[in-house]
A protein has these predicted regions:
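Chalcogenol-based redox active-site neighborhoods
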Residues: 1-178
Length: 178
C-alpha cells in the first residue's frame, strides 16, 4: 500500500492500547480508534519490535516529553505490530520502560483496520512497521510524517518542535525553536 502523507486523512482503524503506566493486565487495555482522543493532536510513533535495542531508547525519550505534548493538546502514542501482552510484559520487565507514562499500542490486525497498513508503513520483509512518526491534527489529517531506516532512531525534541511549528500556523525556518 502507498504511504499516506501530509494532507491525507486517517480513516477507520482499531488498535489495542496499553494504558499509560499499566504494568499488569488488570484494566490495562483499551481499544484506540480513529475516533479516540477527540479534539486532540496525535503524535503516532511506530517502532519495529518490542524487546529490541533501539526501540526502548526512543520510547523513553519520547515519554520524557509526554507532558510537553499534553500541554499542546497532543496525545503521544507509541506502538508496533507486536501484541498488547508483549508490550505489557516488556514494559513491566524493562527498568526504563517501567517508568513510562504514555500510551503504547498493539497494531496486530492485518487488512483494513491495521493502522500501519493504512498509513503505508508496514514493511512486509521484516514483518514489522517502519520507524515512522506521524503528527495528526484534531481532524485526523496528517500534518507531518517522517520515516527512518529500521536501524536509526529519531529525535523526540525535533518532533515536539515540528508540532509547535504546525500549531502556530506560521512559517518556521530551519532549527527555529518555538
Amino acid at each position: 500500500m502507498k504511504m499516506k502523507t501530509v494532507g491525507d486523512k486517517v480513516t477507520e482503524f482499531a488498535v489495542t492500547g496499553v494504558k499509560p503506566g499499566a504494568l499488569t493486565p488488570d484494566g490495562a487495555f483499551e481499544t484506540i480508534t480513529d475516533q479516540s482522543f477527540e479534539g486532540k493532536w496525535k503524535v503516532v510513533v511506530f517502532y519495529p519490535k518490542d524487546f529490541t535495542f533501539v526501540c526502548p531508547t526512543e520510547i523513553v525519550a519520547y515519554d520524557k516529553l509526554v507532558n510537553d505534548f499534553a500541554d499542546r493538546d497532543a496525545v503521544l502514542l507509541t506502538g508496533s505490530t507486536d501484541n498488547e501482552f508483549c508490550k505489557l510484559a516488556w514494559r513491566a520487565n524493562h527498568e526504563d520502560l517501567k517508568k513510562t507514562n504514555s500510551w503504547m499500542f498493539a497494531d496486530v490486525a492485518r487488512g483494513s483496520l491495521s493502522l500501519a497498513e493504512q498509513l503505508g508503513v508496514f514493511y512486509a520483509p521484516a514483518g514489522a512497521a517502519l520507524r515512522a512518526t506521524f503528527i495528526i491534527d484534531p481532524d485526523n489529517i496528517i500534518q507531518h510524517v517522517t520515516v527512518n531506516n529500521l536501524d536509526v532512531g529519531r529525535s523526540p525534541d525535533e518532533t515536539l518542535r515540528v508540532l509547535d511549528a504546525l500549531q502556530t500556523g506560521e512559517l518556521c525556518p530551519c532549527n527555529r525553536s518555538i
